Amino acid sequence: MLQKTNRDSQEALQWLSRFLHLDHRRGKEQLSVAGTKDKRAVTVQKVSLQRGRKTLDEVWRMVNHIGQPVSSAPGTRERRTVELATTTRAERGLRIAQLAYADAPLQLGMLAGNQFTITLRNVHWDNEAERLSDKDRSQLSEALEKRVTEIQKDGFVNYFGMQRFGTGAVSTHVIGIAILRGDFNEALRLLLSPEDREDERDESTAPPHVVATRAGRKAYAEGRYEDAHRLFPKICVAERAVLDKMRMPHWHPSDALGAFQNIPRSLRLMYVHAYQSYLWNSLVSERIRRFGAFRCVPGDHVAELDAALDASTAVTVAGEDAETKHSIEEVVMPMPGGDVILPASGWMADMYSELLAKDGLTPSMLSTSRQPEYRLKGSYRRIVQKPRNARCELIPYEDADAPLCETDEEKLLPDVHLSPRAPLDAPFLALQLVFQLPPSSYATILLRELLRMDTSAHTQKELTKNSADQKVASTHSAPAPP
């Protein structure tokens, strides 16, 4: 099991590859996971390693740097011990535990679902005072519990979340369009363009990674690929992988495909799958606009609730008795691809053709790429999803920086514990939500439906920046380290 903190999945696997001294090229394939996890979170998941002759003990010691200097400072003699590794937080925000042998590696999709614990701070009624009375708190708690009950009963529209489309200046699905067109020069341009679109702050106020990214883009634009590779921060996994190929003496600008193919395979496929997700979201929005999200209607595609959804799933078209025969949970929307048949006529066929034409694509181009790995087979996805075992709790707190949820790593460490709960009349309230979702369903979409507010990263950053608890924290504490 791997716990990662504030780490992108690809970046975390790259660090593990380095710790385990895996081959620079093959390391991408020797570590595998069943699914990617959010970056800005503490996440726990299984990771499989093609270990060669390494034992479990050797793997654990290598990842925990047993016997290595505890500091990179010159003259350091102290070495990292097993005791130190089991009593202090793991380095790089990566903790491994519960190692075991397995007969086969993990593959994408080999998971039943995900459990989330999400804590939202400084909760209050919209457009009301942030300091709530006891009566207001009681009413807020009742309202939230009612909303959780409703969303468990009725579900939420199962959109792909914004993280599916990336947080960069160019959405991942736009790069996917270039790939499906076979235009890898355009894909590289979109990925490495030097335009300062991602952050308009000047260098005195922009975060270090933004400044470094700008410098890397500028070096790329000037043809200084070695410098660009060095300047791009390690979180820019795709950009650095492309530049790693470009900086080689034998690479030629005509080989845009070769440079792009140097990106880890799972990341490359993310771009075309993002476009597939964009199409699906668009089609579902139109279906909901026409017919709502609470009933099955004639013409809907339906699949049994326990069916594993892929291109071979047995799907039927609902007839005139749709509303009485099928629940909204059975309704699925095709994920466009070569192995999925979409209606030949009607609103869905018209909209699908219009979306593709706008992007310079045809239906056949989604499944006939010269690169087989980019050929989309298609699948089905339920348009409404219901969370399982959902519950909520309002937690009073005083310190904006105090943890309100214990991580798995903290449960293992003997001297790390949550602080005692704040008194009930503490100035601030946090909402803690716990729920389970099937694979590929997005917690951010559930939150948007539950709270009826914008859950985009930009909006949430602004809310945090301007919240009352942060203002109190800024007057009592020193600036956080970079």
Over which residues does each language-model region extend?
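Non-catalytic, substrate/partner-engaging modules appended to enzymatic cores
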Residues: M1-P482
